[in-house]
């Protein structure tokens, strides 16, 4: 049984930065779970991401908003994108292709 919607808030940066999981694998992992996805992108400039990076080498040049959009757009239609105040974070509503 699949869910109607997956809510992935404050998740991607942990998987990508702390877990070294590439964005394409994250998108592929989430895609079969539900028709719709609400997902948050947390930029490298965010304090939480800086904490994840403080004790490791920054090898995450591909972890950008532009790459995130491009990679997820290959698996989803981006229905809505909303900047979260002045945080640099973005929320996306997506529909599986």
Regions found by a protein language model. Name each.
Residues 52-58:
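Short secondary-structure boundary/capping segments
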Residues 26-48:
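Conserved beta-strand signature within the Rossmann-like core of class I S-adenosyl-L-methionine
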Residues 2-3:
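Local beta-strand N-terminus motif with an aromatic residue
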Residues 79-97:
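Core SAM-dependent methyltransferase catalytic element
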Residues 58-76:
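Short alpha-helix
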Residues 14-30:
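A short, conserved alpha-helix within the catalytic core of class I
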Residues 6-7:
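A conserved beta-strand element that flanks and buttresses the S-adenosyl-L-methionine
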Residues 11:
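Hydrophobic adenine-recognition pocket in adenosine-nucleotide-binding enzymes
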């Amino acid at each position: 049984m699949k869910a109607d919607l997956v809510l992935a808030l404050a998740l991607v940066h942990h998987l990508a930065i702390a877990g070294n999981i590439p964005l394409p694998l994250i998108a592929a992992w989430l895609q079969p779970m539900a028709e719709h996805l609400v997902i948050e992108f947390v930029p490298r400039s965010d304090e939480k991401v800086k904490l994840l990076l403080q004790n490791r080498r920054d090898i995450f040049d591909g972890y950008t908003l532009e790459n995130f959009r491009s990679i997820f757009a290959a698996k989803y239609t981006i229905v809505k994108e909303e900047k979260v105040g002045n945080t640099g974070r973005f929320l996306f509503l997506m529909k599986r292709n």
